[in-house]
């Protein structure tokens, strides 16, 4: 399974490219990648960049896929799946828990479903902490062509998805969903 790191966002709330912002002397995206590399079921990490930050992302030495659409996470996942099945995360998720990710990938492999996505009991999904089959790409393509850009809606529209009930999991695993959106979010990781 590929670990795909979405890195083609606009960082509007953060004010500068948050993925290159150094935390304890290391760019945010590398903190995220380090966590992904700790997953025993992830064999290779790729970065899904925008045309704008492609060069900066290539500096890190990982395979880079360019997302030419950059219409949000949906085109990031679409681009990632061109390389095969992938576990997809945002590059702004430095608190990923490898054990949790391995758990989802195991459920994905056992289920034979098109995707395996954590879901809260209120129906809210965590699509940037989920496993996707390369076959899900066709569904995304159809949605994108129709101008339907919400990744969560694309998942909900698919019939063969396996959902993981978050409330049934260890409480500590919820930390894995933490993502940096604003400068003040950094307090939570810079102790
Ligand atoms: N490849 C790709 N990645 C994206 C795209 N949009 C968002 N991402 C990434 O997905 C993750 C979560 O997105 P957001 O938190 O909304 O990030 P953002 O768009 O950079 O930030 P805001 O402008 O503040 O919403 C981040 O790591 C982004 O870099 C996109 O269009 N393409
Ligand atoms: Mg975010």
Curated annotation (Swiss-Prot):
Entry cofactors: Mg(2+)
UniProt GO cellular component terms: cytoplasm
Pfam families: NTP_transf_3
Keywords: Cytoplasm, GTP-binding, Magnesium, Metal-binding, Molybdenum cofactor biosynthesis, Nucleotide-binding, Transferase
Signal sequence residues: none
Location(s), subcellular: Cytoplasm
InterPro entries attached to this UniProt entry: MobA-like_NTP_Trfase, Molybde_CF_guanTrfase, Nucleotide-diphossugar_trans
Main EC class the enzyme belongs to: transferase
Binding of GTP, residues: 6-8, 18, 67, 92
Gene Ontology BP annotations: Mo-molybdopterin cofactor biosynthetic process
Chief place where the protein resides: cytoplasm
Record's function text: Transfers a GMP moiety from GTP to Mo-molybdopterin (Mo-MPT) cofactor (Moco or molybdenum cofactor) to form Mo-molybdopterin guanine dinucleotide (Mo-MGD) cofactor.
Swiss-Prot/TrEMBL domain comment: The N-terminal domain determines nucleotide recognition and specific binding, while the C-terminal domain determines the specific binding to the target protein.
HAMAP family referenced in this protein's UniProt entry, alphabetically: MobA (MF_00316)
Name recorded for this polypeptide: Probable molybdenum cofactor guanylyltransferase
């Amino acid at each position: 399974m590929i670990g795909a790191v979405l890195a083609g966002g606009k960082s509007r709330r953060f004010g500068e490219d948050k993925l290159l912002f150094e935390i304890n002397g290391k760019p945010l995206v590398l903190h995220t990648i380090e966590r992904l590399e700790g997953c025993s079921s992830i064999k290779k990490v790729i970065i899904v960049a925008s045309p704008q930050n492609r060069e900066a992302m290539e500096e890190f030495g990982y395979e880079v896929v360019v997302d030419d659409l950059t219409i949000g996470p949906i085109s990031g996942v679409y681009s990632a799946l061109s390389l095969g099945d992938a576990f997809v995360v945002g590059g702004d998720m430095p608190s990923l828990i490898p054990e949790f990710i391995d758990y989802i990938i195991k459920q994905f492999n056992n289920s034979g479903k098109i995707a395996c996505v954590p879901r809260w009991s209120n129906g809210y999904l965590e699509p940037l902490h989920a496993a996707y089959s390369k076959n899900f790409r066709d569904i995304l393509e159809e949605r994108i062509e129709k101008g339907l850009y919400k990744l969560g809606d694309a998942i909900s529209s698919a019939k063969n998805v396996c959902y993981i009930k978050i409330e049934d999991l260890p409480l500590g695993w919820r930390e894995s969903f933490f993502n940096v959106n604003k400068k003040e979010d950094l307090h939570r990781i810079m102790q």
